[in-house]
Structure formats: structure tokens, C-alpha cells
């Protein structure tokens, strides 16, 4: 599948990302400025009727359909390869030994590289939310900024565990962005039933991510005489991954409890 990337090598992209690592920082600063100041600017624009709500909704739908399609195609390539890689090498060697075919070379390497770079245009999600007059919640902008930084670092260093994170993220995003597109298209009542399923998928993703990052950190700080002496992950990346995934796990679990388990407060009309 995708023969045009059979001989692909991502080392040129890796070099560009290493040489321009400051770009990730500048983008995050601009992004946070949008999150904090954007809603106020947009409010004044909406009061002057300078934003076309119908056009904006159409762009929102098409953008989410594009991201869902992108994720599906990437998932079709990366997920089977990740499963085969773990099956052939064993779980521990697959996680701790760098394989360039799972990071930089081959169709899988192509999609891992595209995935790392895709975290930049994904910030457009927030632009659309702000233009709709919404204040992005903490989980939304925290997730976008930290994923961008972590993906950039993991790809540049050739983290041996990156393929796991890519496979999981593409799978969840394939469903999540399709859900957003359908809700915006007028099918919210129908799609509402799968909303808890998506949050559960996200929680499972964070559980696996936490386990993988904690294991790699454990091996790095506690080499085993009868086991792996090290993992091809830097200590900085391992620490960042542990903090990031554990914080995600807490935030998504809290979101699930708040959204689906807590009893809803009744309004005056419903009393």
C-alpha cells in the first residue's frame, strides 16, 4: 500500500526539525496568545457581524472530515505494522530497541514523520473554536501544546516508543474528528451515544501511554541485569512522557466523571 513512499527516508525532515526546534516553541507561544486573547477579539468582531457563521460551520465540518480521513489512512498503515513489530520482536525489544523502519524509513516512517508535523496544522482546531466565540478549555489547549512539543522531541531523537503513541493517536483521532464533523452537520442527537465511547478510548490511550513511558523511564533509571539494560529513549523524553500521559489520564478521567457519571443539575423548568 502507498508504493510511492516505499523508499521514503525521513532523516531530512528530522534534520529540519532539529535545526528549527525553536519553531515549536514560537508556535506554542503564538497559540497560547490566541487562546487567551482571541476570544475577546472575536467577540467584538461578532458584535459587528464580521464573521460569517454559516461559512465558519462549513469550514469546521470539512476540517474535521479531513483530519478524520488523514487519521484513518495513517492508522491503516501504522497500526498493523505496530502489531506485527511487537509480535515479531516481542513487547520489550519492540519498545526499547530503535528500529528506523518504524520511525524514519518505509511507509510507516513516512506516516510517523507526517504525524509529528501534523501537530502544527492541528492547532487550527483551536482557531475554529475561537472564531465560533468559544473559550478553549484547559484540557484542549494543554493537550495541543504538549503533544506538539512531545511529538517534535520524540521524532527528533528517534524515540523507540514513538510508533506506539502514533498508532494510538491516529486511531482515536479517526473516530473523534468524524464525531465532531457529524455533530456539526446536524447529527448531534444520533452521535451523542458514542461520545462516552470516544472518551473511554482516550482514557485507554492514556493508560497505555502512561504504562509505556513509565516502563521506559524505569529501565533507563534501573537497568535490569537479566533484562533490558536501556531503552532508546532519552531520560528527558521519558520524564516528559510520564508527566504528560499521567496528567492526560487524570484530565480525561475527570472529564468522563464530570460528563457521564455525575448527576446533572436540574434547571428550574425541570423541577
Curated annotation (Swiss-Prot):
GO BP terms: fatty acid elongation; fatty acid elongation, monounsaturated fatty acid; fatty acid elongation, polyunsaturated fatty acid; fatty acid elongation, saturated fatty acid; long-chain fatty acid biosynthetic process; sphingolipid biosynthetic process; very long-chain fatty acid biosynthetic process
Active-site residues, record numbering mapped to chain: 143
Signal peptide extent: none
Alphabetical UniProt keywords: Endoplasmic reticulum, Fatty acid biosynthesis, Fatty acid metabolism, Glycoprotein, Lipid biosynthesis, Lipid metabolism, Membrane, Transferase, Transmembrane, Transmembrane helix
Keyword Zinc in record: no
Disulfide bridge positions per record: none
Effect of gene knockout: Genetic disruption in bloodstream form parasites reduces fatty acid synthesis from C10- and C12-CoA primers.
Keyword DNA repair included in the entry's annotation: no
One cellular-component annotation, GO: endoplasmic reticulum
InterPro entries: ELO_fam
Pathway connected to this protein: Lipid metabolism; fatty acid biosynthesis
Catalytic activity: an acyl-CoA + malonyl-CoA + H(+) = a 3-oxoacyl-CoA + CO2 + CoA
Alphabetical list of Pfam families matching this protein: ELO
Glycosylation sites: 52
Biological role: Involved in the synthesis of fatty acids. Elongates C10 fatty acids to C14.
Family the UniProt entry places it in: Belongs to the ELO family.
Descriptive protein name: Fatty acid elongase 2
Protein's organism: Trypanosoma brucei brucei (strain 927/4 GUTat10.1)
Amino acid at each position: 500500500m502507498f508504493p510511492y513512499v516505499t523508499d521514503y527516508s525521513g532523516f531530512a525532515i528530522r534534520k529540519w526539525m532539529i535545526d528549527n526546534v525553536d519553531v515549536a516553541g514560537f508556535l506554542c507561544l503564538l497559540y497560547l496568545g490566541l487562546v487567551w486573547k482571541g476570544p475577546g477579539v472575536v467577540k467584538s468582531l461578532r458584535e459587528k457581524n464580521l464573521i460569517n457563521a454559516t461559512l465558519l460551520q462549513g469550514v469546521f465540518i470539512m476540517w474535521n472530515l479531513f483530519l478524520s480521513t488523514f487519521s484513518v489512512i495513517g492508522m491503516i498503515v501504522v497500526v498493523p505494522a505496530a502489531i506485527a513489530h511487537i509480535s515479531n520482536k516481542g513487547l520489550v525489544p519492540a519498545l526499547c530497541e530503535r528500529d528506523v523502519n518504524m520511525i524514519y524509513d518505509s511507509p510507516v516512517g513516512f506516516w510517523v514523520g507526517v504525524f509529528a508535523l501534523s501537530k502544527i496544522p492541528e492547532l487550527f482546531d483551536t482557531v475554529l473554536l475561537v472564531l465560533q466565540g468559544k473559550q478553549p478549555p484547559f484540557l484542549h489547549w494543554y493537550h495541543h501544546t504538549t503533544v506538539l512539543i512531545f511529538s517534535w522531541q520524540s521524532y527528533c531523537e528517534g524515540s523507540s516508543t514513538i510508533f506506539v503513541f502514533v498508532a494510538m493517536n491516529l486511531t482515536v483521532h479517526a473516530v473523534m474528528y468524524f464525531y465532531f464533523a457529524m455533530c456539526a452537520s446536524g447529527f448531534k442527537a444520533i452521535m451523542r451515544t458514542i461520545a462516552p465511547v470516544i472518551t473511554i478510548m482516550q482514557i485507554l490511550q492514556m493508560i497505555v501511554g502512561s504504562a509505556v513511558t513509565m516502563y521506559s523511564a524505569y529501565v533507563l533509571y534501573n537497568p535490569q541485569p537479566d533484562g533490558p539494560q536501556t531503552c532508546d529513549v532519552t531520560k528527558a523524553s521519558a520524564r516528559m512522557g510520564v508527566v504528560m500521559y499521567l496528567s492526560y489520564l487524570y484530565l480525561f478521567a475527570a472529564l468522563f466523571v464530570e460528563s457521564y457519571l455525575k448527576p446533572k443539575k436540574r434547571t428550574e423548568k425541570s423541577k
